[in-house]
Amino acid sequence: MFTLKKSLLLLLFLGTINLSLSEQERNAEEERRDDPEEMDAEVEKRAILTTLANWARKFLGK
């Protein structure tokens, strides 16, 4: 019984650490998105993809 409790406690501890690291990584990604240069790069990517999609529709006649 004691080893079962120890195992569950270890799993709980490791799960807590995993959630903490995931939250830190998510926060870091959000900070990068808040960077104006990063936002400009994302907008440029979308603009290029939209332009390519429009050209494809134009040439394919759809």
Curated annotation (Swiss-Prot):
Function: Has antimicrobial activity against some Gram-positive bacteria and fungi but has no activity against a range of Gram-negative bacteria except P.faecalis. Active against the Gram-positive bacteria S.aureus ATCC 25923 (MIC=37.5 uM), S.carnosus KHS (MIC=37.5 uM), B.licheniformis X39 (MIC=19 uM), R.rhodochrous X15 (MIC=4.8 uM), is virtually inactive against E.faecalis 981 (MIC=150 uM) and inactive against E.faecium 091299. Has some antimicrobial activity against the Gram-negative bacterium P.faecalis X29 (MIC=75 uM) and is inactive against E.coli, P.aeruginosa and S.typhi.
Secreted found in the keyword field: yes
Pro-sequence residue ranges: 23-44
Signal peptide positions on this chain: 1-22
Superkingdom of the source species: Eukaryota
Protein name, entry field: Temporin-HN1
Organism this protein belongs to: Odorrana hainanensis
GO biological process: defense response to fungus; defense response to Gram-negative bacterium; defense response to Gram-positive bacterium; killing of cells of another organism
